[in-house]
Amino acid sequence: MDYRKILQERLNQEIENLSISIETKNSLQNAIWGSLSFYTCLPIDILNSVPDSKKYLDQVIELSVSSSFYLVSLIMVDKLIDNQEKVNGAIVEYLFFVKEEAIKKLQNLFFNNTLFWKTFQSLKCLVFSASQCRCKDFEGDNEKLLTILLNKSALVKLYVVSMKLIVQEQIDWDNILESLKSFHIAFQLLDDYEDLKEDIRSGQLNYYLAQEKNVDSESEEVEVQLKKLMATEIVENGLMIARKNACLAYKAFGKMSMKHSQQVSSVLVKEIDFVLTDIHLLKIKAEAKAKLSNVLVKNNQLNIALLRSKAFIYNNQEIDGSWKDFLTLAGDGHNWITAFVISMFAEFEDNKKDLKKAMAWLGENGGKYNQNVFSND
């Protein structure tokens, strides 16, 4: 039976009754039924795998409402704090909301249950600890890395603990936990890919950055580091692991009649496939550029002109060496088009002024000739 409509009506009513602004209500609705809908529907999805599901429906709906409020509030408060100068009023609303509504609902549901509250506190500590990890401090193998990253979503285990307390029937809880683990591996690896730029700047622990030991977040530009990662197979391999786990979750959820979880897993597979296709096309483009840039100049007169150009540029470059990237990545002695153009600039006296203008422009832009080798430009 599809209990989603019942849950949706109840959540809409609960949100409408909250003493918060319309804007806040709308943001809650969007989060609950948007990016976090997997967790919103997880309790009723698990309920669908229970033979006699109707007798547990009321309590499970209560669990869905309270857990949705808590999880969405927790995540949105965290995002708001990052922009607190602009949204102080909204932060106050959400903090009040978490304390007075979400926690209160959980207390009403599991007031005297020691197991629930001990598990709750323990999992919250895991989430907090994982969120504080930084790439520069990480030491360990791939298994340890995944364990820490999965702790970011550790609260999902509380759904299973809660459902076991409500549903007094023997169902395959271990299989549910294993399926959730597969889903979250896929979700985390895709999320880390999407957050690469942000995590390079912040230094937050990221699956791909933790494996690339040659990345120096303190001395290199973000785009340069992204190119390093793309040039290796770290990102592609990680996303293949993500795809494998998303497919495992899709099959497992389907066998347990967890339709919404299966649907979200299907969307996850498609999103990963899209990224993998995009990366593959970018690599083909980069390889094509590399081949074109490695055509050796074999004309002696052009080589002589190129040497003059090289000498001119070296003599006129800034102390910071901003043209070094141009000379190396453009391919000193390679790519006859580049060679011809810069030779013509440097060979004739009248063109030196234009060359200086070009150098000034490149200098302002860091002299990065191959800046967009992995872009769609």
Placement of each model-derived feature along the sequence:
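All-alpha helical catalytic cores of prenyl diphosphate-utilizing isoprenoid enzymes
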Residues: 3, 7-16, 28-42, 63-67, ...
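Solvent-exposed loop and edge beta-strand segments that line ligand/cofactor-binding
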Residues: 25-36, 90-91, 95, 144-149, ...
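Long, hydrophobic/aromatic-enriched structural stretches that serve as scaffold segments
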Residues: 32-83
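Well-ordered alpha-helical scaffold segments within catalytic/enzyme domains
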Residues: 43-52, 101-110, 159-168, 248-252, ...
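Extended, well-ordered alpha-helical scaffold segments
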Residues: 63, 91-94, 115-123, 175-179, ...
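Acidic, Mg2+-coordinating active-site segments of isoprenoid diphosphate-utilizing enzymes
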Residues: 75-101, 161-169, 181-233
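Primarily interfacial, aromatic-capped hydrophobic alpha-helices that serve as membrane anchors
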Residues: 104-128, 215-262, 365
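Preference for long, amphipathic alpha-helical scaffolds in soluble/luminal domains
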Residues: 285-377
